[in-house]
């Protein structure tokens, strides 16, 4: 289990096309994004068939994963159809491996990915997404780094058919796609550990290419034969490579337990198949897993220390030639496979001694696969000595000690104490482990050596494993009959939570293997105790950190075989020079035949002396196996060379807390007086060091043991910060002195003086910024005559310590330490020198140390007689040897591709170096200045970058494409501009202070250093800068004189946007706003907060007058506006970025870009603290100019893209040839529905609008004359899709879908927004329905529409109504008669009566009755009255 890290993953779901829906009907799609236990759901889009647009973004910036988990991490996009009363329907999914994205140059991918369905092999559409994945220290990609998609530029706006999104095309594979079937076969699992419920219920799952397959489930067993094959259809290219195999234990009424997980590389599987082989599973014990997770969460790295079983797997990839051969993912039965060839094997072990273990008794266990055996329990020498002397505690006292031990155990205290535990022949003999193992060494079990302790008085409840070691079976030596081996010391690894046990224990033992079934085990080898002298040459230490917050008072202790010696204590220094040879008289077991000793682990521990006692800082464990003896006649004496060793400290002994320069030497005690010690004093050259200090910036001082609370400082919470006022900075400059053994006078004190003694009118300013940070001008130069070792391995260091007034621990602010190796004038090869002084982990990792030959200039180039040499060191750890072999194999494999072509030698020599780098590129690094980047030319440490003076340009179509031009007509840099300015003479170097195990940046110091030898100019330093910076008067005139800068300047800050902001809680949407700090002035733009967005667009220009040096520190803060529960403000501080304006003003490169009005745009990271994690990125640039000439410098009109509003009017005239026969009907009740998907739509009209119904159309023709309006479409928009769909109307139930057409309207909107001229287009558009399309049916009808695009201002002056409502104009729409009559409505309902044949007789009858009525009224009625 590797240490956990914080990763950032973000994505944008753009759109989906050509979705395959059930029965071809429109659905309500959404996208569900899953990643590392997180889930995000997009908005549901309604009634979509083929094209769906989302444009939704989300970011997770707090994914806490180990290295192994990151290797297998995926982000999965599932397109689902939402259902109201049952489970959503899966339309398609795609997975992307995050590790592959993180390895890309821009850490992101933007692509249309094919959607797959687990039940078949067809492509179910495509999903266009943008995904980025960043490891710790990597900033999210800037918008300029996105992979721009090529789009055609349509200039014809009259033909609406060109805006149709063609979703009727057949979804095809990418060009160059290859088809595969991947077969992963799980044959058998064995030796699964028992759980709390007893036997296991195991099953196996396999995940790849968006599919997850599961085997059958076994019941109540720890070994089971599956013989099942997982088949996956794979089409390359594929955005994932890892095939995940997981072994689970089924649980009833709770989550299944994951036993083990493994991965197979698909790319390797394509080159060669994996024949069935055993994979051994290793993990952690159930009782230790909680502690292991805790340690990993705090940055610790753990090694699996328990055998959890094994699985027999086979895999292969089969290439297919036809797409018809591709079959869906499925689990099928596999033919049983014979077990790989096996051989008998026995593991033999004898334990001689255990050293450095706490507890009363110890026992050593050998664990190999399913077999394990232990030694007997042995009591330590201290307990035995107490028993023999009669001072052992009586029964009552022992009971009291036991009670105290139980209390310590319950409190969780770590047991302390060390003891030696010798084993005799009987106690140390481990029972033979007789096994049957695979013949292939890679499939054989590892051997786990565990150390168990017991002892209630020591705080151990029961048998407790405190340390272990895992060894490969192939590294175990073979057993030779009647020839016992000499024992060796095996270093152990502490188990959680015993990492803080002083040194890790070690075991002196013999472990062998025998492949003979019948053998006679001989007695273990007899070894005798012989006296030796261990000489530990402790030269120096560097970069030491004290958890107390003050400067450490360090000393080094070297311990071996129960003997220890210490150096003297050095006070208040982080880079002490000890120059001390510690002599340890030790007794070690020696083989009487070979006369070679068994060297016990050598523990080098760094402590600091405090007033209350001794505090642990760091430790390194060295394993040494060389013996220095007398010289033979004619043999030249051996020379020695020290090496820098890493020290590990912290709560779990996993943090790098400094380095120590060390050399070890072992000789026989009888030869100690004959063999002299190596001379430690190196050959030195006297040099002159010039230290020019400009001043200190942004200083903070807190209580000694209190951390600096940056967030509370930004919030102005003075009580929580507990800051102390800084009245007068004091600088202590010291340089390592090897000639005087660290006791020389290579140091100087610089005090802040407000007025110069020689000129009281000259004032050095001391001021405070708005964030309570102290700043001061020093302007002092000190010249020091120092001794510099000729050999750079000693790494002389310059240390700057800053105090407040007094040089006492409670006034300590921080320190800065730098190596002088890049400044040494006679060092010729800086690359090799820096590699030589880089620390190694410890001697266990040092299989082959590299010599420093060729580093020195002139007569020192090849002479090692005047300096030191090196004793080769070799590790005893089998794991380290294996790592070295693997590294060597990798080097040879890579070197095969780097072949030399002699034919190109003449041409390449003209402009290439032997390393392959262009000469002009390397020469550009020779810019004067000592803080230069060294070019590493080996294949593992290549760090070449393009300097600021180089311009890269593109040719061809991409260069002419307007999308590649900078949006704001200026260059840009991918990070901060300071990293690209190489002429800054006084850069800001961080002052650091260790508090409570963490490091705070407490300020910055600005200085210049020059190192000369024999008064010759230093080739690594700018000679022109050294001339004026070496004098206080010239430096003051250059930086504070009348011509240095105008009395009043003006700053312009252009902030475009922020990217991927994170407030620390996924449930909170930020409302970002900007806050500007300049000196003691602060301006907030809280009133302009952008609501509910992680990617706000500010488009803000901020101007302010600047007076140097008071306003030289500029800080841009980003906050999130929130209201508290009680009604007050409860804003959240997101992060800030700081710029030193003084550096930029005095940079000639920056002034040149400013004069051309081409200041680069920056993507500056936002952090809550200088050493914290990224909280986002801000896109901005800064201009600085003379106040009087500010009017001559044009101000860039930084405005957000004009929020032009456009209105869309859709007029549906009618339709023809609607294919209603596909619905099984003889007529159609036609209806047209429009749906707008647009990110910028802000209108009040509904997104979905529909026409009235044209009833009872037997020809498929329909007339509507219907207007739909979408007002207030705010520009710009990323996409705008209008869906026009035809339906067969149903008054009850869902209306059947006939066909649709989708239009991309973005370019029409952009044209109207830029020209403010309306666009009116007419077209007859073809309707499509992919689900019902066949060879006989290719057309589903046509719809006649008119689209009007009008600026909102014009549309407001000429409003229109929806449908045919008033105002009805432009054009006037009439109500059609067709399809609206009663007979049409009744005919649609099936109630239509055809009365046309009876119409003639109805009219005749009516005439007759009318005539009779007239006759009666005219003649009969008057006569009756008369």
Swiss-Prot record:
Residues 1357-1377 are annotated as: Disordered. Residues 1-111, 161-279, 512-638, 1031-1154, 1189-1318 form the C2 domain. It comes from Toxoplasma gondii. Keywords: Cytoplasmic vesicle, Exocytosis, Membrane, Repeat, Stress response, Transmembrane, Transmembrane helix. SMART domains: C2. Residues 1366-1377 have a biased composition (Basic and acidic residues). This is Ferlin 2. It is found in: Membrane; Inner membrane complex; Cytoplasmic vesicle, Secretory vesicle, Rhoptry. It holds the Pfam family C2. GO terms for biological process: plasma membrane organization; regulated exocytosis. Belongs to the ferlin family. GO terms for cellular component: cytoplasmic vesicle; inner membrane pellicle complex; membrane; rhoptry. Disruption phenotype: Conditional knockdown results in inability of parasites to form plaques in plaque assays after 7 and 14 days due to invasion defects. Impaired rhoptry secretion. No observable changes in the morphology or growth rate of intracellularly replicating parasites. No significant effect on the localization, morphology and apical anchoring of the rhoptries. Its main location: membrane. It is a single-pass membrane protein. Coiled coil: none annotated. Regulates rhoptry secretion. Required for completing the lytic cycle. Required for host cell invasion. Not required for microneme secretion and conoid extrusion. The chain crosses the membrane at residues 1404-1424.
């Amino acid at each position: 289990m590797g240490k956990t890290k914080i990763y950032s993953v973000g994505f944008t779901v753009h759109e989906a096309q050509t979705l395959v829906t059930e029965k071809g009907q429109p659905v309500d799609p959404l996208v569900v994004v899953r990643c590392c236990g997180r889930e995000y759901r997009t908005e549901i889009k309604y009634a979509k068939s083929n094209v769906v647009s989302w444009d939704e973004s989300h970011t997770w910036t707090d994914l806490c994963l180990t290295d192994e988990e990151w290797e297998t991490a995926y982000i999965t996009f599932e397109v689902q159809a939402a259902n109201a009363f049952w489970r959503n329907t899966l339309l398609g999914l795609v997975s992307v491996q995050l590790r592959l994205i993180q390895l890309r140059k821009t850490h992101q991918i933007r692509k249309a990915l094919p959607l797959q369905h687990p039940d078949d092999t067809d492509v179910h559409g495509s999903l266009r997404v943008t995904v980025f994945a960043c490891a710790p220290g990597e900033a999210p990609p800037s918008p300029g780094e996105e992979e721009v998609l090529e789009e055609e530029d349509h200039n014809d706006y009259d033909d609406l058919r060109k805006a149709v999104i063609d979703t009727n095309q057949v979804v095809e594979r990418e060009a160059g796609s290859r088809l595969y079937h991947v077969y992963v076969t799980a044959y058998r699992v064995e030796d699964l550990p028992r759980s709390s419920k007893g036997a296991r219920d195991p099953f196996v799952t396999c995940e790849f290419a968006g599919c997850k397959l599961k085997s059958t489930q076994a019941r109540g067993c720890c070994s089971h034969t599956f013989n099942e094959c997982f088949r996956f259809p794979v089409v390359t290219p594929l955005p994932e490579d890892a095939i995940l195999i997981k072994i689970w234990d089924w649980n009833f009424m709770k989550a299944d337990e994951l036993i083990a997980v493994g991965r197979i590389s698909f790319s390797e599987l394509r080159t060669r198949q994996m024949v069935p082989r055993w994979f051994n599973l290793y993990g952690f014990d159930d009782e230790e897993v909680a502690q292991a997770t805790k340690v990993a969460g705090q940055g610790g790295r753990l090694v699996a220390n328990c055998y959890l079983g094994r699985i027999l797997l086979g895999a292969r990839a089969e290439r297919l030639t036809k797409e018809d051969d591709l079959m869906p993912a499925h689990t099928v039965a596999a033919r049983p496979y014979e077990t790989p060839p096996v051989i008998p094997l026995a593991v033999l072990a004898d334990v001689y001694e255990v050293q450095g273990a706490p507890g009363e008794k110890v026992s050593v266990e050998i664990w190999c696969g399913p077999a394990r055996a232990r030694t007997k329990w042995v009591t330590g020498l201290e307990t035995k000595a107490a028993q023999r002397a009669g001072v052992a505690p009586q029964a009552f006292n022992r009971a009291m000690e036991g009670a105290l031990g139980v209390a310590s155990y319950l409190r969780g205290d770590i047991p302390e104490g060390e003891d030696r535990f010798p084993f005799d022949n009987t106690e140390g003999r481990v029972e033979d482990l007789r096994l049957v193992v695979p013949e292939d060494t890679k499939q054989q079990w590892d051997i786990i050596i565990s150390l168990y302790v017991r002892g209630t008085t020591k705080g151990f409840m029961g048998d407790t494993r405190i340390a272990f070691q895992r060894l490969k079976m192939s590294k175990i030596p073979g057993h030779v009959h009647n020839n016992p081996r000499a024992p060796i010391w095996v270093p152990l690894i502490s188990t959680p939570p015993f990492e803080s046990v002083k040194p890790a224990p070690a075991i002196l033992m013999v472990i062998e293997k025998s492949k003979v079934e019948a053998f006679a085990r001989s007695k273990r080898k007899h070894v005798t105790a012989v006296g030796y002298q261990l000489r530990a040459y402790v030269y120096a230490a560097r970069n030491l950190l004290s958890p107390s917050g003050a400067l450490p008072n360090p000393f080094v202790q070297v311990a071996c075989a129960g003997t220890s010696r210490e150096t003297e204590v050095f006070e208040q220094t982080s880079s002490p020079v000890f120059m001390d040879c510690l002599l340890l008289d030790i007794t070690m077991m020696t083989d009487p035949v070979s006369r070679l000793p068994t060297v016990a682990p050598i523990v080098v521990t760094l402590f600091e002396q405090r007033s209350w006692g001794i505090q642990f800082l760091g430790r390194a464990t060295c394993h040494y196996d060389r013996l220095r003896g007398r010289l033979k006649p004619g043999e030249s004496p051996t020379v020695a060379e020290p090496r820098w060793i890493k020290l590990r400290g912290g709560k779990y002994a996993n943090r790098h807390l400094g380095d120590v320069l060390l050399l070890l030497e072992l000789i026989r005690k009888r030869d100690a007086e004959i063999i002299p010690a190596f001379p430690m004093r190196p050959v030195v050259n006297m040099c002159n060091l010039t230290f020019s200090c400009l001043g200190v910036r942004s200083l903070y001082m807190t209580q000694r043991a209190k951390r600096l609370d940056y967030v509370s400082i930004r919030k102005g919470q003075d009580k929580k910060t507990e800051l102390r006022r800084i009245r007068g900075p004091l600088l202590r400059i010291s340089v390592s002195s090897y000639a005087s053994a660290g006791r020389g006078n290579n140091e100087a004190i610089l005090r802040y003086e407000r007025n110069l003694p020689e000129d009281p009118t000259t004032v050095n300013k001391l001021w405070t910024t708005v964030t309570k940070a102290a700043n001061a001008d020093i302007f002092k130069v000190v010249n020091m005559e120092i001794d510099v070792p000729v050999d750079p391995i000693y790494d002389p260091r310059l240390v700057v310590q800053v105090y407040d007034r007094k040089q006492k621990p409670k006034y300590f602010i921080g320190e800065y330490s730098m190596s002088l190796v890049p400044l040494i004038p006679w060092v010729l090869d800086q690359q090799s020198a820096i590699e030589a002084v880089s620390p190694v982990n410890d001697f266990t990792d040092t299989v082959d140390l590299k010599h420093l030959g060729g580093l020195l200039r002139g007569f020192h180039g090849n002479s090692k007689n005047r300096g030191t040499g090196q004793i080769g060191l070799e590790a005893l750890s089998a794991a380290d040897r294996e790592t070295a072999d693997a590294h060597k194999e990798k080097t040879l494999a890579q070197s095969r591709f780097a072949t030399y072509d002699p034919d190109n030698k003449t041409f390449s020599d003209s402009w290439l170096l032997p390393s392959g780098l262009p000469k002009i590129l390397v020469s550009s690094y020779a810019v004067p200045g000592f803080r230069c980047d060294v070019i590493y030319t080996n294949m593992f440490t290549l760090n070449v970058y393009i300097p600021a003076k180089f311009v890269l340009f593109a040719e061809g179509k991409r260069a002419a494409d307007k999308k590649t031009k900078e949006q704001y007509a200026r260059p840009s840099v991918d990070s901060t501009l300071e990293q690209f300015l190489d002429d800054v003479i006084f850069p800001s170097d961080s002052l650091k202070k260790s508090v409570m195990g963490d490091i705070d940046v407490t300020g910055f110091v600005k200085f210049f250093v020059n190192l000369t030898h024999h008064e010759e100019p230093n080739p690594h330093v700018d000679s022109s800068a050294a001339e004026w910076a070496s004098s206080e008067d010239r430096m003051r005139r250059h930086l504070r004189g009348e011509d240095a800068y105008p009395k009043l300047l003006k700053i312009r800050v252009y902030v475009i946007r922020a990217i991927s902001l994170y407030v620390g809680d996924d449930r909170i949407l930020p409302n970002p706003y900007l806050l500007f700090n300049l000196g003691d002035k602060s301006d907030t733009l809280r009133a302009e907060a952008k609501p509910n967005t992680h990617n706000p667009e500010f488009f803000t220009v901020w101007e302010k007058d600047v007076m140097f040096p008071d306003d030289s520190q500029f800080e841009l803060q980003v906050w999130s506006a929130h209201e508290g529960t009680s009604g007050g403000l409860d804003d959240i501080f997101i992060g800030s970025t700081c710029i030193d304006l003084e550096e930029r003003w005095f940079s000639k490169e920056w002034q040149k870009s400013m004069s051309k009005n081409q200041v680069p745009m920056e993507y500056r990271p936002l952090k809550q603290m200088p050493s914290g994690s990224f909280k986002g990125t801000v896109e901005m640039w800064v201009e600085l100019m003379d106040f009087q000439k500010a009017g001559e410098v044009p101000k860039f009109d930084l405005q957000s893209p004009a929020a032009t509003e456009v209105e869309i009017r859709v007029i549906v005239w009618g339709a023809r040839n609607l294919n209603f026969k596909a619905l099984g009907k003889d007529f159609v009740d036609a209806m047209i529905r429009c749906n707008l998907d647009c990110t910028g739509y802000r209108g009040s009209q509904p997104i979905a609008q529909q026409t009235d119904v044209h009833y009872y159309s037997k020809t498929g023709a329909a007339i509507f004359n219907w207007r739909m309006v979408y007002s207030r479409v705010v520009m710009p928009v990323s996409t705008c899709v209008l869906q026009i769909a035809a339906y067969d109307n149903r008054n009850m139930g869902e209306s059947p879908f006939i066909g649709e057409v989708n239009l991309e309207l973005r370019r029409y909107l952009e044209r109207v927004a830029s020209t403010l001229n309306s666009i009116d287009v007419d077209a007859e558009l073809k309707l499509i329905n992919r689900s019902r399309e066949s060879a006989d049916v290719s057309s589903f009808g046509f719809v006649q529409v008119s689209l009007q695009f009008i600026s909102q201002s014009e549309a407001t002056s000429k409003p229109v109504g929806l449908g045919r409502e008033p105002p009805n104009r432009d054009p006037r729409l009439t109500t059609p008669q067709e399809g609206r009559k009663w007979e049409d409505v009744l005919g649609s309902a099936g109630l239509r009566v055809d009365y046309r044949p009876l119409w003639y007789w109805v009219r005749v009858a009516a005439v007759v009755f009318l005539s009779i009525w007239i006759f009666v009224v005219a003649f009969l009625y008057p006569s009756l009255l008369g």
